[in-house]
Amino acid sequence: MADSTILQPEGLEQRYERYKEKIKHFTIMNDIFMRNVLKETACTEYILQVIMNRTDLKVIDQTLQKDYKNLQGRSAILDCVAKDAENNFFNVEIQGENDGASPKRARYHCGLLDMNLLNPGNPFDSLPETYVIFITKNDALGYNQPISHIQRRIKETEDIFQDGQHILYVNSKKQDDTELGRLMHDLHCKEADKMYSNVLSARVQQLKETTEGVNQMCQELEEIYNEGEQSGFLRGEQSGELKKARETTLALLEMGMSAEQIAKA
């Protein structure tokens, strides 16, 4: 008869110590760490200023990890949607794998933004300019460019089709001595004192090196760990299976995966 003994979970204090070690290795390219960095609106604003090459860009509102609904089809949780002072909207996505940054996913994100930005009865021409920005770990498009701008054109004339929809791919492997390259370096940097941007460095230092920031990160990791248990991801009849599942969850947390991604792993 199979042993159905359930392995006792490690204590909260033990997990917090493990979390603290993992937090040291987080970068802004990690999903969990990114959304905590971007809770400081100045960080979102700086990233957009560099990518858009606009020092005058001012973020006046943003939402993080919001579930954008499609009542007739698939919804999606968007990492960050920011609004600037000129009523432009920017969806910033950090993508560690190429399959999370496919052209058709970018197209779908554009559609979700449109569906959620146009109120009933409003004219179509009141749709704002939208920018879907994928910051990718690898060269997702394969053009060996630091940044690729995608916009519809009229084939016969090469004129831009003025629908107000823009897609940008930013290749974070390109870390040359330009403002964009230095930003990409910072997104991959684990240590605040080695970052170029004072804005990003201050926020990373706060989250990694202050008691308040570390506790905030530990609490979030614990919430994700508990969500994993509640979803059944960590349940197993064999103690060995349960131990392996817990180790897997902690490893996925270290990679910066969200609760939703861990549940699907």
Segments (PLM) and residue ranges:
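Accessory alpha/beta interaction modules
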Residues: M1-D163, D176, S231
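Short, charged alpha-helical interaction segments and adjacent helix-coil junctions
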Residues: A2-K24, I28, I32, F90-Q95, ...
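Short, well-ordered beta-strand micro-motif
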Residues: F134, Y169-N171
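Low-complexity, glycine/alanine/valine/leucine- and proline-rich hydrophobic stretches
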Residues: I154-D163, N171-K173, L183, L187-K190
